[in-house]
Amino acid sequence: MAPTLATAHRRRWWMACTAVLENLLFSAVLLGWGSLLIMLKSEGFYSYLCTEPENVTNGTVGGTAEPGHEEVSWMNGWLSCQAQDEMLNLAFTVGSFLLSAITLPLGIVMDKYGPRKLRLLGSACFAVSCLLIAYGASKPNALSVLIFIALALNGFGGMCMTFTSLTLPNMFGDLRSTFIALMIGSYASSAVTFPGIKLIYDAGVSFIVVLVVWAGCSGLVFLNCFFNWPLEPFPGPEDMDYSVKIKFSWLGFDHKITGKQFYKQVTTVGRRLSVGSSMRSAKEQVALQEGHKLCLSTVDLEVKCQPDAAVAPSFMHSVFSPILLLSLVTMCVTQLRLIFYMGAMNNILKFLVSGDQKTVGLYTSIFGVLQLLCLLTAPVIGYIMDWRLKECEDASEEPEEKDANQGEKKKKKRDRQIQKITNAMRAFAFTNLLLVGFGVTCLIPNLPLQILSFILHTIVRGFIHSAVGGLYAAVYPSTQFGSLTGLQSLISALFALLQQPLFLAMMGPLQGDPLWVNVGLLLLSLLGFCLPLYLICYRRQLERQLQQRQEDDKLFLKINGSSNQEAFV
């Protein structure tokens, strides 16, 4: 039996804490591809694509034939070669594509039906993916193709859990961007999961046993969702103020309630307690003819409940807004830069160390451990996105009816919308500076310096998703958050498919040297500064509009003696 929204709100801290842990262990684990790749090679996936040259024996590691022949090596008794790398990288491309692209239909479904069913489906798909990899490892020569299906289900299931967890911050009010960043930080840190599994694997535990146990743990996610997540979507702070201490059962609708339903119910009750219908209807007609709002309490509730259609932009209007379009450019460039590095990291390291597999394995483990930085760094962007918003909220909550002299002496407060845009501009500018720094370190063929590249890669990956999520939550209606985030993820995932031809170009014509690919990606990453530059211009536009409104209010006050333009006389 699914709990009510009121029950879910009481359990919000438990749900948030478990969601962070579940994201860490079961969401975007494919981001730890470097460690999984080593284990798949050691288990013989697509090893049959490699042919052993005559001058290579079983004891040779990294042995090469004559210059005209392909380089091969042995890993745990299985052959490893370039053809195997290309096929497994293609499987990673498919899985990482679904990890992002599936968010559009997920967002549409979640906005309409809520996160519960999607989270149940995601945990089940993740468990099936683990079992498929384990089954493929039992007969790799015949069942290697299962890795494509398994990684596809892994990406789909992981994104279901990640995406549904992004609705939980709606229950935390002004801290919503911070909690979104925390969820995204745990999602980004899930890249540490496969390095952790690799440590268990290196300790001698069977690969199949590890995956079966992991699939069983995914069942716990299913049970947690079944008993704690409600059927209805979580209403945003603008739709429901959870801080109001009221028992919904007093009003008779504790079972299913959203912000709009609450106001509708209160309006209905208000009508019954109001003045006679004949008196109210006459005033309504006069007000509608003259274009004014009514001050009657019951009608005022209804009037204030209806402007959502006028205030909230349509979905298509949001899609073609400059902020969304420029955020797509930023995400496409950043996603391609990050995904290419994750997919090609082992080969890049192998090029730097001339094929030393032990050193490659060591640096891959270091990269995996550093993914935990996302849990610490991602909330920083969320904090930047929430910077001083509480002061703006306090300003809007002050009583409106004050003397003119008191109004002039009152301390000037920040405009909430302008503060949101300012925070987003700072977040994206800082993130893109780090992305450019990451591109510069990738150009330097120095092995110890790659640790700095690992750190910058991890920080940027956590920052960019947190910044985009916080921007969408701040600028667009909560009912469009899932669809817009899904659209952004789909387009950036399609663009990130270019990482496969870039990988083939690096391994083929460039003979494993990533220099020119990194140069091109560095130049492309400069496009990410378009969004913060536009946000600067947009902020100035909002400031001019605010100044004009303030001047109009002063003029109205001077003429009428009151700043209330909604009074009906």
From Swiss-Prot:
Topology in membrane: Multi-pass membrane protein
InterPro entries attached to this UniProt entry: MFS, MFS_trans_sf
Glycan-modified residues: N55, N58, N560
Any one annotated GO CC term: plasma membrane
Pfam families the record matches: MFS_1
Gene Ontology molecular function: amino acid transmembrane transporter activity; L-amino acid transmembrane transporter activity; L-isoleucine transmembrane transporter activity; L-leucine transmembrane transporter activity; L-methionine transmembrane transporter activity; L-phenylalanine transmembrane transporter activity; neutral L-amino acid transmembrane transporter activity
PTM annotation (Phosphoserine): residues: S274, S278, S297
Signal peptide per UniProt: none
Tissues of expression: Detected in several tissues with higher expression in placenta, kidney and peripheral blood leukocytes. In the kidney, is detected in epithelial cells of the distal tubule and collecting duct. In the intestine, is expressed mainly in crypt cells of the intestinal microvilli and epithelial cells in the base of the villus.
Location(s), subcellular: Cell membrane; Basolateral cell membrane
SUPFAM superfamilies: MFS general substrate transporter
Main location: membrane
Catalytic activity: L-leucine(in) = L-leucine(out); L-isoleucine(in) = L-isoleucine(out); L-methionine(in) = L-methionine(out); L-phenylalanine(in) = L-phenylalanine(out)
Record-annotated membrane-spanning stretches: 20-40, 90-110, 120-140, 143-163, 177-197, 203-223, 323-345, 365-385, 435-455, 462-482, 490-510, 516-536
Post-translational modification summary for this protein: Glycosylated. Dephosphorylation at Ser-274 and phosphorylation at Ser-297 increase affinity and amino acid transport activity. Phosphorylation-dephosphorylation cycle is regulated by food-entrained diurnal rhythm and dietary proteins.
UniProtKB keywords: Amino-acid transport, Cell membrane, Glycoprotein, Membrane, Phosphoprotein, Transmembrane, Transmembrane helix, Transport
Regulation of protein activity: Affinity and transport activity are regulated by a phosphorylation switch state at Ser-274 and Ser-297; increasing of affinity and amino acid transport activity via dephosphorylation at Ser-274 and phosphorylation at Ser-297.
GO biological process: amino acid transport; isoleucine transport; L-leucine transport; methionine transport; negative regulation of amino acid transport; negative regulation of L-leucine import across plasma membrane; neutral amino acid transport; phenylalanine transport
Family: Belongs to the SLC43A transporter (TC 2.A.1.44) family.
PANTHER family per the UniProt record, alphabetical: LARGE NEUTRAL AMINO ACIDS TRANSPORTER SMALL SUBUNIT 4, LARGE NEUTRAL AMINO ACIDS TRANSPORTER SMALL SUBUNIT 4-LIKE ISOFORM X1
Its job: Uniporter that mediates the transport of the stereospecific L-phenylalanine, L-methionine and L-branched-chain amino acids, between the extracellular space and the cytoplasm and may control the transepithelial (re)absorption of neutral amino acid in kidney and small intestine. The transport activity is mediated through facilitated diffusion and is sodium ions-, chloride ions- and pH-independent.
The protein's name: Large neutral amino acids transporter small subunit 4
